[in-house]
Amino acid sequence: MRVVVAPDSFKGTASADSVASAVAEGWRRERPDDEIVSAPLADGGEGTVEGFAVARPDGIRHDVEVEGPEGPATSAWLELPDGTAVVELASAAGIELWGTNQPFTASTHGLGEVIASALDAGATRLLVGVGSSASTDGGAGMLAVLGARIIDADGDAIGPGNAGLADAVALDLSSMRPVPAGGVVVLCDVSNPLLGPFGAAAVFGPQKGAEPDDIPVMNGNLSRLAALGTVDPATPGAGAAGGTGWALLQWGAEIRSGAESIGAELGIPAIVATADVIITGEGRFDGQTAAGKAPAYVAALAPGRTMLVAGSIDADVSAFPAAVSLVDLVGRDRALNDTIDALIEAGAALARRASEPDLS
């Protein structure tokens, strides 16, 4: 049997590569003669650069010092041989860096610094993953690093974060760095607009520490920025990453499904085409998964042949012939604190399921 293990990362506990390795180890304990192929995935969030680096060993990693909440921090981008640069917001301006207690001041400045580094090195195309954002600044920090001027009534640059947008009276993009010749693709797993009840502040603000009373203020600040631009704030994906989707569209980027685009770049359709079984997964399988996350993408590529492993499962899994929740398998404490061993057990459980008459 040929088995492809193609999971996303388990956010905060295990990288996609680690998940794939652990599941494969468990599977081999039960079915040692099977051929196992590791194909870790990402959907534009945490682990996007790492996922490409594992799948594309011909890439060159470039570390970049970025502005963090408590001083300099280190992010990175990956240079591919064709001139493409893979960039992720998560390590440059994400929750992992900023935490969830600065909803009004967290900035996308670091993302701009990483993009600028890639452009300085001669990148001819950008793939920008925008998941795991900490900010709701409408991408203003990123735009400023790339040469945009967002000014207040005195003609000065506005302050950082969503709070700074309250003072914005003009947006000047005339001095922005040009989009590279091969274009900019935003890798995104959501289709939310910038504003309103389904927008960046209302839907994602609480994940970044915003209180209920903060949401109308944050939405109003984003609305002020949107009024200064030319991109329709209702554009699907404009609300991604606290409005960074809108800012990248303003620059000239296009938005695409993160998992699907990354899968195509990494050759996932061809890899799974000849597999007997595919195992995919993510930290939490819930109602958002069908909106473009890795498990839904893989299941659509190989219907009836895709098994699921997740930290927790809170949605219908009828599309998968077998599914394992780490919380159900080993308990919540072990699932969170001993994730790799739990994944090994999950891999073994799925292998046993594959040996049952209705699946073998």
Model-derived features: positions:
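N-terminal loops that bind phosphate or other acidic moieties
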Residues: M1-V130, A134-S360
